[in-house]
């Protein structure tokens, strides 16, 4: 293993695309040619890999274009990628590499990194004229550029809204953050009425086995007491409010501890003497190896004397301080429970 490592040298990396460029001193067979154009929709493809450590395996499938619901481009490959095939090439009928195996959603729904990511990485290396000396710094630069582009796109859009109970919440902003929700309105046995809405991005940027970033998630909950007394209802509200977690994972080697700021507000009702009690919690943890990047977790909860409650929440992974502040301001300006 040591001799193998000594004969290879990292020359470039694209963390979002999950591809790297290596230089080897070994004598290698002729490289596989890289496709210069995308295949036609429905073209046969052949994925190569070592599934479950069973040896070199060829898996046939079909090209179904670039997934339009992913922020980072991914080829939709209709074929069965399995554990052990990640990083292997997928070839066209003419033997050209059209993508790199990266993930599967099961039921023959799999994804490839487009070969364009390799073309871009090679072009970047040629323009630079030398290898990357500090890979941690380079990855940090790519992560910061990636989040800057993502949030500039988000802030440039109108954020659509929808009703959830008596509250106004944020609907699907962009295709790469899918939304779903539900309610218990059809249940006759429910102790309270509830409705919820969740939107979450499908793009994780892999950094290590226990560390990923790039996730965006926002959630809303509407609650109304029905059969619960006020004490029971408030206890459930408090339990739900404290049950949120970050959208990504990382160890103490990767991330600092969360630092949180809580604010309590009393918002007077316009129409009667009842009051709403509101709580905001804003938590931030820093990335140890990537300065100026943070994970952010935000919670807002409001409960009123008529035993109704509204909770909103978002989590952002790998975001700059400025973009986090802009997001929370925009979020609170759109998601609200009108008087």
Place the predicted regions along the sequence by residue.
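Conserved positions in beta-strands of structured domains
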Residues: 9-11, 64, 82, 179
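Short, well-structured beta-strand
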Residues: 139-142, 263-339
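Short conserved aromatic/hydrophobic patches within beta-strands of well-structured domains
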Residues: 168-179, 331, 335
């Amino acid at each position: 293993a040591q001799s193998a490592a000594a004969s290879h040298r990292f020359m470039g990396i694209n963390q979002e695309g999950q591809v790297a460029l290596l230089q080897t001193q070994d004598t290698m067979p002729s490289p596989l040619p890289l496709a210069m154009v995308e295949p036609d929709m429905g073209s046969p493809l052949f994925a190569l890999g070592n599934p479950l450590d069973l040896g070199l395996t060829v898996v046939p499938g079909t090209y179904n274009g670039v997934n339009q619901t992913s922020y980072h481009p991914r080829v939709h490959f209709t074929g069965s990628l399995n554990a052990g095939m990640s990083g292997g090439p997928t070839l066209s009928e003419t033997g050209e590499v059209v993508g790199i195996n990266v993930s599967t959603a099961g039921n023959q729904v799999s994804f490839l990194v487009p070969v364009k990511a390799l073309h871009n990485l090679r072009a970047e290396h040629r323009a630079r004229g030398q290898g990357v000396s500090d890979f941690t710094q380079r990855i940090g630069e790519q992560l910061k550029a990636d989040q800057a582009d993502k949030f500039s796109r988000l802030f440039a859009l109108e954020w659509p809204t929808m009703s959830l109970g008596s509250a106004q919440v944020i609907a699907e902003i962009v295709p790469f953050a899918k939304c779903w929700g539900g309610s218990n309105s059809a249940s006759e046995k429910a102790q309270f009425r509830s409705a919820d809405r969740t939107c979450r991005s499908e793009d994780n940027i892999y950094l290590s086995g226990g560390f990923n970033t790039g996730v965006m998630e926002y959630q809303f909950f509407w609650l109304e007491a029905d059969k619960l007394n006020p004490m029971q209802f408030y206890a459930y509200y408090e339990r739900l409010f404290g049950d949120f977690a970050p959208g990504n994972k990382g160890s103490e080697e990767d991330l600092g501890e969360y630092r949180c700021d809580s604010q309590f507000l009393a918002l007077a009702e316009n129409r009667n003497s009842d009051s709403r009690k509101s709580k905001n919690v804003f938590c931030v943890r820093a990335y140890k190896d990537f300065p100026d990047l943070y994970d952010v977790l935000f919670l807002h909860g409001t409960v009123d004397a008529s035993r109704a409650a509204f909770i909103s929440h978002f989590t952002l992974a790998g975001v700059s301080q400025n973009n986090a502040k802009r997001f929370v301001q925009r979020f609170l300006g759109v998601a609200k429970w009108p008087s």
